[in-house]
Amino acid sequence: MQHVKELSAKLKEKKGFALKMLIGLDGFVDEIIHPVDKRQDYKTFTRIKTIGEFGERITKAAGLSTNIEMVTIQTKLGGNGPILSNALLEYGVKLTYVGALGTPDIHPVFHPMTEKAAAVYSLCNPGLTDAYEFEDGKLIMGKHSSLSSLTWEVCKKGMGGAEGIAKMVGECHLFGMENWTMLPHMSDIWQGIIDEVFPLLPATAEKPLAFFDLADPEKRTKEDIRRAMGLIGKFEQKFRTILGLNEKEVYEIAEVLGITISDSSTDKLKDTVVAVHKAMGIYCLMVHPVRTVCCAIGDEYFFTEGPYCAKPKLTTGAGDNLNAGFCLGLALNLDPLSAITLGACTSGYYVRNAKSPTFDQAIAFAEDWDAGKV
């Protein structure tokens, strides 16, 4: 693909960039878990490979009972905001993080991230996640009670009031507040920013970017989702607003917004993305199915195949890494097709190596992808 071939050259021209970003608000301690199928001895086991197999195991236990062993493969930082931030920091962004990293002390899993960050504001304790990994996807089991203490008043108190927040936001190229679904007061926080921070923001020749990721809104009511979409739209007053979704989410948002796309459409994904983007009135809607990435900006639609990995080392966080690459691309003023391609490279590297790439590693990955080596 020509745009993959061209990406590495475009990135080389951007080396040595200086970007500031402010990201929040969640934080999770993730345990990456493999459910056991058969155990050969106390060290060796075969895992349950697919979600379907796992579902069959559970279904067979109905009316009876069963015991499924879970093996923790890794304990790591989690949450959309921290994983997104970790990837951006690896790229060399000067980043401030605000969120649920632990109080009074930051949880040790976040220390590598916070040591690289320009500044950190930890406002409450993190949530906990059990991530059951399979070859065809993952099941995320979350414990979120600690996040209910993260309110607009707590944000203001921890960040120097509306004036302190405005100063931080006003100095950034990109501002992001992630994981609306799991933060029960996020809509109120957004409303507080609109009401109290927007009037304090300086006028700029070009509006900075604002990035939002809902994180699977299925469990929230349609009224909640509709309100959140309206608030995200209002950020367009001060920002070039980006909403990042996966394929499942974009169809859910379309339904909430009353958008119906016929199943007979020759490209249902494109038609849905374009319609949701237009309905929301925002700068950009980016959607990442498992094997592809696309976005709508202005009146244009952009699409790329991705470097699909059949047997990933790690999938939890793949979407956040894609978001990081895409956001970095737009912040570097890459064209939209190059930005989604950088997102695909970032995610592609991450699932193969279980870590985020550096800028040089992303360039090398793009070259390998173009050469058919990934």
Q: Where are the regions that the model predicts?
A:
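Conserved post-catalytic alpha-helical subdomain immediately downstream of the catalytic base
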Residues: 284, 307-373
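Alpha-helix C-terminal capping segments
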Residues: 85-94, 328-333
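Ribokinase/PfkB-type carbohydrate-kinase core domain
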Residues: 1-64, 71-80, 90-301, 353-374
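A structural signal for well-ordered alpha-helical segments within the folded catalytic domains
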Residues: 79-82, 86, 248, 324, ...
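Glycine/serine-rich anion-binding loops at beta->alpha junctions
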Residues: 74-87, 313-321
